[in-house]
Amino acid sequence: MFAFFQSHLRPIVFWTACVLLTFFCLTRFGDVSAQLPGPILISREDSTRAIAYDSVTHQREPFTATAPIKFGSDPATRIMVFAMNLTLQRDEAITAVTADAEDANHNVLSLTVEHVGTVPDQPWATSIVLRLDEQLGDVGDVLVRIKYQGAISNRVRVGIGHVGGGLADDEGAVPTPGREISIAPPPPKATNLTATDVQTLIAQAASAATSLGHPVTIIITDREANVLGFFPMSGSPATSTVRSVGTLGRGLEGASVMAFQAATAKAVTAAFFSTHGNAFSTRTAGFIIQEHFPPGISFRPGGPLYGVQFSSLGCGDINRVNGKLGLSGDPGGLPIYKNGEPAGGIGIEGDGLYTVDRDPTDNDQPFEELIAASALRGFEAPAQIRADNILVDGIRLPYSNVVNPPAPPTIPFGSLVGAFLIFPPAGPPDSQFTPAVVGGISGEVSTRFFPFIAGTAPAGNTLTAAEVNTIISHAAQQANITRAAIRQPLGSNARVTMAVVDSEGVVLGVFRQQDAPIFGYDVAVQKARTAAFFSSATAGARLRAAGFGSYVDRALADGLRLDGSVAFTDRANGFLHRPFFPDGIENTAAGPFSTPISEWSPFNDGLQLDIIKTNLVSVITPPFGPLFTCTSIPGLANGIQIFPGSVPLYKNGVLVGAIGISGDGVDQDDLIGAAGANGFSPAPAIRSDQVFVRGVRLPFLKFPRSPNL
């Protein structure tokens, strides 16, 4: 169950055939000649040295007993080894597998088995994570074996402290080979774009804009929202006006924003939404955030990512990005791919209007999208993974209305008047993410939120660091076998970010699977905080104290006290945030946390925007204040999120936090969150699906059909 054996971490070269060789164990370990064939630990082709990796850093031996990167609640190193002839039965615990190691002095130390799982695409191979005994010093080679159902494996060599020395191989021991497993290290940088690439993209965009007669602002970002190139063409508008539908002057409708902020939001959105398995544009984003899905079709529920535009905000404390505005649904942002690899995004702003496409049927081709498409010649997304090859609920997503982008002669970059390039002089920025393995699943963490920590509440009413690790591990293991909704090729597993917070919204741990879309990093925390906040005993009081008592009163009118008596998931909370209640049903009143449909717009959706509006405006208008909280409400520093993918967590009947999931289909997010929450779920009697509002049962969770691969 290791995701690094899949997707973009290929070229992982796994053996294609294994030669099962007869071997014998020493008599001192018991006669196993009458046993059925036991597990076989896999070694190199030329020796009995194990195929083994540090499960966090992916480094090869020699290993230290104390981990170079601390994992969980203890400093011990975890290593991965691999076996054949080992498959746990359904519902069989990993305790069925044991392991030990013998050093040169014949000291035999038990090794804790922490994970046993099938290697994806190699059902005959099993990965095993072992925690080294901290008593192991610089002992050199030890002989490691495992036991399962009375059967004892061969012993393989593992170097501790240094390689060499140790006991001689067991009598009759031979290599149990396969072709070398080579785990490719993750890209050390946030992009593979060079300064020349950025110059080419800007020159192609500026040339297209010149040929169309529309000067624009051009922004190039890497995958993690670092701005690599900024070029405001002479004569391009300096500002844009936020305008969609609804009442002018309400929410952000009518607000003036800087053109470079709008362009950056577009580039960031395209970069954050795109991976090796899907390429989404800002047109895609605008399609999935409106009051109906598809937009304009009555009596359809809201978009699956309704509310995502208010994430990755410049005022937040999680994913602090240069865009400030959050995510964009305004056409003109496209992902950049280099040699088929996701590398960043381009954003074009120049029409003076920051909006969303309210009519996806008119096949409009705004010049901003034309220019972005022209700029990407040579940097296009692979056709197979574009949004228009991905269906959600049977609905094909849009990508770009530009079929044949303009291709005028390119003006040399050096001849572009006023060009301003901010490509970092030291080269591409380092990634904020570090490789890590949690629950046997390969992914990435930020050192800001790793190692995982315990909750901040008094002892006994909080999550321990070990429990946080268990929750995230269970979620990651479920994600690794969950059929993805938005990835190509079909049959890929979901790739998500998992976040756990305590009851006060303090982040206890965040884990991102390899190639999970980066927008989910901020959103997962938002979802977790939202579930913890609205399930708390003080939610109503804190909202009222912050000046949002009108929403509390509307909830009370619907029988919702916001006093901790109901365990709210984000699916339930989002249901209450829709401009129609029930969701999508025309001619009904708005949910208690939404604005009325007569005033509603994607830039004025109710409580979600209102609690962040003051601080958001302060970072998008001069002097662009450097805030690190979006609200005045404790526990909601990066705002709230209102589409599914979170579960509140309880321990001994007490709210101790929440888990948030983001990165794939919302039903998949719910399923993965439920797996993480297993053992910490709310009592059935207080779940949101036991509550009726206006005669309508609130939802709790919704799982996809046949979810597992």
Model features per residue range: what roles?
Residues 35-186, 195, 211, 465, ...:
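A sequence-level detector for low-complexity, Ser/Thr- and acidic-rich stretches
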Residues 1-9:
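N-terminal secretory signal peptides that target proteins for export/translocation
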Residues 15-26:
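Bacterial N-terminal signal peptides
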